[in-house]
């Protein structure tokens, strides 16, 4: 059994401009809104498979194409240029500490736009890998009621300080901390235990600040783990999912849907 994948069938492409950026956004579904930010190398078939899963579970999904070529498989040498561009692009600030990333302002605007067009109390935002932390930074805007951080990998973990960094500025984190206390803003974070790109120290930083409003799912990827995950397991909600009950990544995907329903409906 392989990871669930899909193509662009049924997705409506529309450019969306905000905060000086314009990206194509792929939309599909009916119900409460979810911004699904793709992982590297972009809107690959695994991300589209996750998008269809959310649509099938009653959500309107908007996927901004921030990098890469939509529909391109997440493998091969074609990955390298996309990764390289992402690491040096100013809007992502991949190595910066205590940084408000310009792309998060765009994502907040997209969340507001989606909220204006969908039912529900607000919208959810899912970030993955390179974009994992952007999902929580987007929650500075009160249109966002639920953030899902799947294997958040920015800033890239090149030092102890980078591993501890929450992936946003102190100003942003203070706003989110206040929203958690006053508005019951909640976040769900996921990682594999052996994944050095999504360090556990980052989760501990956020847990210390947000307390019970920061739910953590850590999937065992140590040698001999019962899920059969390899030592480089990384993509919790896409590449490592096998659609059978009890498979840990599939159960994590189910929890994401449950979490979004709890927060948005």
Give residue spans per PLM region.
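N-terminal cap/leader regions of alpha/beta-hydrolase-fold enzymes
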Residues: 1-265
């Amino acid at each position: 059994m392989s990871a669930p994948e899909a193509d662009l069938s049924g997705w409506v492409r529309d450019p969306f401009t905000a905060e000086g950026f314009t990206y194509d956004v792929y939309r599909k579904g009916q119900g409460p809104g979810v911004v699904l930010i793709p992982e590297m190398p972009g809107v690959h078939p695994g991300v589209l498979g996750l998008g269809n899963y959310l649509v099938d579970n009653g959500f309107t999904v908007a996927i901004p194409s921030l990098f890469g070529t939509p529909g391109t498989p997440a493998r091969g040498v074609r990955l390298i240029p996309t990764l390289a561009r992402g690491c040096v692009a100013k809007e992502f600030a991949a190595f910066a500490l205590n940084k408000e990333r310009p792309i998060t302002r765009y994502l907040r605007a997209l969340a507001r736009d989606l909220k204006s067009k969908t039912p529900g109390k607000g919208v959810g935002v899912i970030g993955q890998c390179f974009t994992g932390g952007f999902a929580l930074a987007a929650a500075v805007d009160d249109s966002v009621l639920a953030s899902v951080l799947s294997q958040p990998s920015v800033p890239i973990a090149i030092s102890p300080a980078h591993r501890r960094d929450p992936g946003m500025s102190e100003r942003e984190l203070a706003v989110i901390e206040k929203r958690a206390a006053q508005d019951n803003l909640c976040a769900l974070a996921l990682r594999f235990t052996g994944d050095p790109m999504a360090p556990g120290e980052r989760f501990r930083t956020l847990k210390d600040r947000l307390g019970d409003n920061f739910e953590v799912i850590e999937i065992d990827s140590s040698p001999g783990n019962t899920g059969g995950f390899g030592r480089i397991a990384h993509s919790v909600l896409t590449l490592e999912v096998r659609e059978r009950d009890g498979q840990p990544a599939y159960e994590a995907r189910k929890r994401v849907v449950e979490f979004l329903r709890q927060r948005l409906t």
